[in-house]
């Protein structure tokens, strides 16, 4: 899979791309991540200016349509496979595990990171990108949201995780749409808190049953909206999860 990230601040990604599983995935050729500085497409060459004040007044600056559209088209042409274009915005579809799984089936994704007051509306009208949000809050720019999408998607690619079962058991995942069960490691006891006996029994069927029960109980307590029967009784929620 290839990611192309369009951003005003490509250096923000320096540390992120050289750590942990993502770095290993890049080294092993499982994923390619290219960063593109939008300022390289600035028409105002001396100052590399790609923003201007909004028509009608108001605070802040908008990213201009000309350099953005040209940049996205040029970047799209850098590889044979057309990119799935995604614009990061708090107004977009909420990122969830199902969407991450869908994105993981793509061969190439372009992430458009906004700044300031966002993009000129004509960027959306002309390029028709998917709009994705990581939550009902506002960030200084789309870079952190882009990292979130990359992280959520890359871990789903074959070969990235040491054990493919790991992603299936995660909360919200295709192997378990509910919240994940509690997990324990050594020591068996700490300050009076002990590991449940069933996890030490070696009885795999009993362990699986305990985990399923705990997963459901935790979901009922914390996220009842994730329960299948809740979705059936709430068509609007079902549509969101489909």
UniProtKB/Swiss-Prot annotation:
The keyword tRNA processing applies. One of its GO terms (biological process) is tRNA N1-guanine methylation. Residues 223-233 have a biased composition (Basic and acidic residues). One of its GO terms (cellular component) is cytosol. Residues 223-242 are annotated as: Disordered. Signal peptide: none annotated. S-adenosyl-L-methionine binds at residues 114, 134-139. Specifically methylates guanosine-37 in various tRNAs. This is tRNA (guanine-N(1)-)-methyltransferase. It comes from Rhodopirellula baltica (strain DSM 10527 / NCIMB 13988 / SH1). The gene is trmD.
